[in-house]
Amino acid sequence: MGLSDGEWQLVLNVWGKVEADIPSHGQEVLIRLFKGHPETLEKFDKFKHLKSEDEMKASEDLKKHGATVLTALGGILKKKGHHEAEIKPLAQSHATKHKIPVKYLELISESIIQVLQSKHPGDFGADAQGAMNKALELFRNDMAAKYKELGFQG
Protein backbone atom coordinates (compact mmCIF):
# COMPACT_ATOMS: atom_id res chain seq x y z
CA MET A 1 0.00 0.00 0.00
CA GLY A 2 2.92 2.24 -0.70
CA LEU A 3 2.72 5.73 -2.07
CA SER A 4 4.05 6.83 -5.43
CA ASP A 5 6.86 9.38 -5.63
CA GLY A 6 4.28 11.97 -6.66
CA GLU A 7 2.11 11.18 -3.64
CA TRP A 8 5.07 11.47 -1.28
CA GLN A 9 5.88 14.84 -2.87
CA LEU A 10 2.33 16.06 -2.16
CA VAL A 11 2.64 14.88 1.46
CA LEU A 12 6.01 16.54 1.96
CA ASN A 13 4.94 19.77 0.25
CA VAL A 14 2.09 20.33 2.70
CA TRP A 15 4.25 19.09 5.58
CA GLY A 16 6.65 21.93 4.81
CA LYS A 17 3.80 24.31 5.69
CA VAL A 18 3.33 22.46 9.00
CA GLU A 19 7.02 22.74 9.81
CA ALA A 20 6.90 26.50 9.35
CA ASP A 21 4.89 26.60 12.61
CA ILE A 22 4.97 23.20 14.31
CA PRO A 23 3.82 24.44 17.76
CA SER A 24 0.55 26.01 16.58
CA HIS A 25 -0.23 23.11 14.25
CA GLY A 26 0.46 20.60 17.02
CA GLN A 27 -1.61 22.53 19.52
CA GLU A 28 -4.55 22.71 17.11
CA VAL A 29 -4.31 18.98 16.30
CA LEU A 30 -4.44 18.04 19.99
CA ILE A 31 -7.26 20.48 20.77
CA ARG A 32 -9.32 19.05 17.89
CA LEU A 33 -8.57 15.53 19.09
CA PHE A 34 -9.53 16.25 22.69
CA LYS A 35 -12.65 18.26 21.82
CA GLY A 36 -13.89 15.76 19.24
CA HIS A 37 -12.97 12.68 21.27
CA PRO A 38 -12.85 13.60 24.99
CA GLU A 39 -12.04 10.00 25.92
CA THR A 40 -8.57 10.48 24.42
CA LEU A 41 -7.80 13.14 27.02
CA GLU A 42 -7.85 10.44 29.71
CA LYS A 43 -4.59 9.00 28.32
CA PHE A 44 -2.77 12.24 29.10
CA ASP A 45 -2.24 12.79 32.83
CA LYS A 46 -0.69 16.19 32.08
CA PHE A 47 -3.82 17.42 30.28
CA LYS A 48 -6.74 15.67 32.03
CA HIS A 49 -7.51 18.82 34.02
CA LEU A 50 -7.92 20.94 30.86
CA LYS A 51 -11.66 21.07 30.28
CA SER A 52 -12.22 24.08 28.03
CA GLU A 53 -10.71 25.05 24.71
CA ASP A 54 -9.42 28.25 26.34
CA GLU A 55 -7.59 26.21 28.99
CA MET A 56 -6.11 24.03 26.25
CA LYS A 57 -4.98 27.05 24.23
CA ALA A 58 -3.33 28.54 27.32
CA SER A 59 -1.39 25.36 28.15
CA GLU A 60 2.29 25.56 27.21
CA ASP A 61 2.62 21.83 28.00
CA LEU A 62 -0.09 21.00 25.46
CA LYS A 63 1.60 23.19 22.85
CA LYS A 64 4.95 21.51 23.57
CA HIS A 65 3.47 18.03 23.32
CA GLY A 66 1.73 18.91 20.06
CA ALA A 67 5.09 20.05 18.67
CA THR A 68 6.70 16.79 19.85
CA VAL A 69 3.99 14.70 18.16
CA LEU A 70 4.20 16.51 14.83
CA THR A 71 8.01 16.63 14.87
CA ALA A 72 8.10 12.84 15.30
CA LEU A 73 5.47 12.36 12.59
CA GLY A 74 7.40 14.65 10.25
CA GLY A 75 10.53 12.55 10.74
CA ILE A 76 8.52 9.46 9.84
CA LEU A 77 6.87 11.03 6.78
CA LYS A 78 10.26 12.17 5.44
CA LYS A 79 11.38 8.53 5.37
CA LYS A 80 8.74 7.91 2.67
CA GLY A 81 7.69 4.56 4.08
CA HIS A 82 11.19 3.44 5.10
CA HIS A 83 10.54 4.29 8.73
CA GLU A 84 11.26 1.06 10.62
CA ALA A 85 13.91 2.71 12.83
CA GLU A 86 11.53 5.54 13.75
CA ILE A 87 8.44 3.36 14.28
CA LYS A 88 10.03 0.79 16.57
CA PRO A 89 10.72 3.02 19.63
CA LEU A 90 7.50 4.96 19.07
CA ALA A 91 5.42 1.77 19.04
CA GLN A 92 7.32 0.48 22.06
CA SER A 93 6.53 3.57 24.16
CA HIS A 94 2.95 3.92 22.92
CA ALA A 95 2.18 0.23 23.50
CA THR A 96 3.96 -0.47 26.77
CA LYS A 97 4.15 2.88 28.59
CA HIS A 98 1.31 5.04 27.28
CA LYS A 99 -1.07 2.23 26.19
CA ILE A 100 -2.41 4.22 23.23
CA PRO A 101 -4.82 2.09 21.16
CA VAL A 102 -4.56 2.06 17.35
CA LYS A 103 -8.05 3.61 17.29
CA TYR A 104 -6.59 6.74 18.88
CA LEU A 105 -3.97 6.89 16.12
CA GLU A 106 -6.88 6.91 13.65
CA LEU A 107 -8.53 9.72 15.59
CA ILE A 108 -5.41 11.89 15.67
CA SER A 109 -4.92 11.21 11.95
CA GLU A 110 -8.41 12.63 11.36
CA SER A 111 -7.49 15.68 13.44
CA ILE A 112 -4.30 16.18 11.41
CA ILE A 113 -6.29 16.05 8.15
CA GLN A 114 -8.84 18.55 9.53
CA VAL A 115 -6.13 20.97 10.65
CA LEU A 116 -4.39 20.78 7.27
CA GLN A 117 -7.72 21.40 5.49
CA SER A 118 -8.41 24.37 7.73
CA LYS A 119 -4.95 25.98 7.69
CA HIS A 120 -3.81 25.18 4.15
CA PRO A 121 -6.80 24.81 1.83
CA GLY A 122 -4.82 26.01 -1.19
CA ASP A 123 -2.08 23.43 -0.66
CA PHE A 124 -4.27 20.58 0.53
CA GLY A 125 -6.62 19.70 -2.30
CA ALA A 126 -8.13 16.30 -3.00
CA ASP A 127 -4.89 14.78 -4.33
CA ALA A 128 -2.83 15.96 -1.36
CA GLN A 129 -5.55 14.82 1.07
CA GLY A 130 -5.62 11.39 -0.54
CA ALA A 131 -1.84 11.12 -0.36
CA MET A 132 -1.74 12.24 3.28
CA ASN A 133 -4.49 9.77 4.19
CA LYS A 134 -2.45 6.98 2.58
CA ALA A 135 0.73 8.06 4.37
CA LEU A 136 -1.04 8.19 7.75
CA GLU A 137 -2.66 4.81 7.10
CA LEU A 138 0.76 3.33 6.31
CA PHE A 139 2.07 4.77 9.58
CA ARG A 140 -0.89 3.36 11.56
CA ASN A 141 -0.62 -0.07 9.93
CA ASP A 142 3.08 -0.25 10.75
CA MET A 143 2.42 0.89 14.33
CA ALA A 144 -0.31 -1.76 14.64
CA ALA A 145 2.06 -4.45 13.35
CA LYS A 146 4.65 -3.45 15.96
CA TYR A 147 1.98 -3.39 18.65
CA LYS A 148 1.11 -6.95 17.71
CA GLU A 149 4.77 -8.01 17.91
CA LEU A 150 4.86 -6.48 21.40
CA GLY A 151 1.70 -8.33 22.43
CA PHE A 152 -0.30 -5.11 22.82
CA GLN A 153 -3.90 -5.54 21.77
CA GLY A 154 -4.56 -1.81 21.39
Swiss-Prot record:
The protein's UniProt keywords, in alphabetical order, are:
Cytoplasm, Heme, Iron, Metal-binding, Muscle protein, Oxidoreductase, Oxygen transport, Phosphoprotein, Transport
Q: Which reaction does it catalyse?
A: Fe(III)-heme b-[protein] + nitric oxide + H2O = Fe(II)-heme b-[protein] + nitrite + 2 H(+); H2O2 + AH2 = A + 2 H2O
| Subunit organization | Monomeric.
Per the record, residues carrying Phosphothreonine are 68
Q: Where does nitrite bind?
A: 65
Catalytic class of the enzyme: oxidoreductase
Q: What is its EC number?
A: 1.7.-.-, 1.11.1.-
- Return the protein name: Myoglobin
Residues that bind heme b: 94
Q: Where does O2 bind?
A: 65
PANTHER family with a match to the protein in the record: MYOGLOBIN (PTHR47132:SF1)
Q: Describe the task this protein carries out.
A: Monomeric heme protein which primary function is to store oxygen and facilitate its diffusion within muscle tissues. Reversibly binds oxygen through a pentacoordinated heme iron and enables its timely and efficient release as needed during periods of heightened demand. Depending on the oxidative conditions of tissues and cells, and in addition to its ability to bind oxygen, it also has a nitrite reductase activity whereby it regulates the production of bioactive nitric oxide.
Q: Which GO terms describe its biological process?
A: removal of superoxide radicals
